[in-house]
Amino acid sequence: MSWPQERTLLAHDFQSSSQGWLVSGDTGQFEPQFHAAGGHPEGYISHVDEALGETWYFRAPEDVVRALPAAENGTLSYSLKQSADQPGVLDDDIIIVGPAGRLSFRFATPPGTRWTPFAVKLAAGAGWRWNWNAPATQAQIRSVLANPTSLEIRGEYQTGPDEGALDSVVLRAGG
């Protein structure tokens, strides 16, 4: 879902590569597996959980992080799927970090075993949290987006071995 008047800043559709995305947080940092077909549409990236470490995330490459300042009041959207539909781990779905602090967001439902689209507005009132705690204000969102150092999208939703997949990442500027 996108909101009116939003200009696309970048889109990663994983048609020919992993486009610089990494996996972080399991037991280290890895390149995700690239799949040329089966995505939403065409290619996608995935990771099979080692079931040894903490919740793992897809970590955005520099071009995505550099585009975040222009995305204030815009949207971040993507599609996810997981290997099982079971009650899982409660954790942040999106994390954006910068010297000013940490923003996090949790969707109401996890992805299913088929491609599930997600979208969130990069603005106050959308459900963003500031430094693990309070609702984020627009000034706090602006301060983190002004100089971000990382963007991570959750890939793990189960305890134990599982697989998560990511596709169709789009960052749009606010109107």
Task: Show where each model-derived region lies.
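Bacterial Sec-dependent N-terminal signal peptides
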Residues: M1-R7
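Extracellular glycan-recognition surfaces and repeat-rich motifs
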Residues: D13-E50
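Extracellular/lumenal carbohydrate-interaction signature centered on repeated Trp-anchored short motifs
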Residues: E54-S77, D85-G88, T109-G112, I141-N147
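Extracellular beta-strand-rich recognition modules
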Residues: L76-L80, T149-G155
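Beta-strand acidic-aromatic groove motif in beta-rich domains, primarily in extracellular
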Residues: S83-G98
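Extracellular carbohydrate recognition and processing domains
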Residues: A100-R142
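Extracellular carbohydrate recognition
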Residues: S143-L145, E156-A173
